Amino acid sequence: MRSITSSKRVCAHCLSRSRLFSTTVQHRAQPSSNAVPSSPPRSGYARLTNRGLISITGVDSTTFLQGLITQNMLIANDPRRATRRTGTYTAFLNSQGRVLNDAFIYPMPKGDSETDTTGDPAWLVEVDKNEVSSLLKHLKKHKLRSKLKLRALEDGERTVWSSWKDHAEPRWAAYNLESESSSPFAPSSSVAGCIDTRAPGFGSRLVTPGEEDLRVHLPDEAQVAGSQVDLGTYTVRRMLHGIAEGQAEIIRESALPLECNMDMMRGVDFRKGCYVGQELTIRTHHTGVVRKRIVPVQLYANSAPQSGDTPVYDPSAAVALPPSGSNISKVDGRKGRSAGKFLGGVGNIGLALCRLEIMTDIVLTGEGSHYSPEQEFKISWSAPEEGSSSATEPGEVKVKALVPPWLRDYISSGARNLARKVDNQEGHRAKELLYQLEEEEEQRRNE
């Protein structure tokens, strides 16, 4: 078995610096494989064959991306980041503020023939491999007269990696903070990358030229530790940390960035100027309450799992995996609105979009919570309709939503800030009412 634990709580102050899903759901059967992914090692790296790359080069490439993504591309205005050549986590939204694609964006490494001759800004956009053509179409639609070139990289041109060292992560990486030291990705390096800020201590994201092993480019044990693992093992580690990735889990044109925890993951800059989809995102951040979020879930058949805040992966567990998009409901409960939606999983763990005040003990507002520790939840699904290509068998499994410590701290800090904001607003209204009553009393005296 493999579980992730956190001995330290994330500082809420540090983290603070940094329409719901459609009811029409296409059930997608989980991919079947005879090989069960192994538990992730404490140190290792994985070749991410499910990710694709798009190059954007040209004098207007930076401002072009600035108007399309949730992250701030104009790092030259920030003295702490101006000298750094690191990538960043971000998202492309549609005009309604829903996610088109989650992505990483990296400065083009030196030695690239497309940029070395011109010296113009150039970027690599990493995205779900199945979504490269869709994102490229979206970019071309917004290109207009911008002076830039767009190109999807061929397989083998560059390779995307995830690398981690659970026992030796720098404190600034473990807490989703940027190091004050110089970037490990030097301007002269052929390797692009960044600290993966989607969960504390999750590791680094790297892009290397060609198809060679990561150690060919980074032979130093201090940079890359452990052995290479397969994509399935990386997926297990990602889900244990509660990280959704790609449009199989972050549903295109349906998911909202804050429900996908992109605010906690430092994928949204709430101080930047206009970009596509900004209005709903900013309004929700400043005035709304995010009642649903993606969290890791534990799947089980009979006995409830032990209490904890992170799931435990058991490769030998005999648990049926529900189809993606399946509704979560209360066990022995009346039919009503769904408590959440299952997004995907591996073995006995997965990810789900959950209503926090129903499936967890998180309290978001002063209205109180509907959560009960004794209440169990289930996912039930029927056989696909006749003629469907899906081979999913009908079944049912119980599910428990878990909130990792870093996400709990972030949500709690937001709830406290909201409560203080409401108290301040009520205080201002009370003062205004008092002044109004005093003025009316003064007028009556003068009559």
UniProtKB/Swiss-Prot annotation:
Family annotation (InterPro entries): TrmE/GcvT_dom1, YgfZ/GcvT, YgfZ/GcvT_CS
Main location as per UniProt: mitochondrion
FT transit peptide: 1-28
Chain intervals with Polar residues compositional bias: 25-37
Localization annotation: Mitochondrion matrix
GO cellular component, one term: mitochondrial matrix
A Pfam family matched in the record: Beta-barrel_CAF17_C
Keyword Glycosyltransferase: no
PANTHER family for the chain: TRANSFERASE CAF17, MITOCHONDRIAL-RELATED
Family per similarity comment: Belongs to the GcvT family. CAF17/IBA57 subfamily.
UniProt name for this protein: Iron-sulfur cluster assembly factor IBA57 homolog, mitochondrial
Organism for this UniProt entry: Aspergillus fumigatus (strain ATCC MYA-4609 / CBS 101355 / FGSC A1100 / Af293)
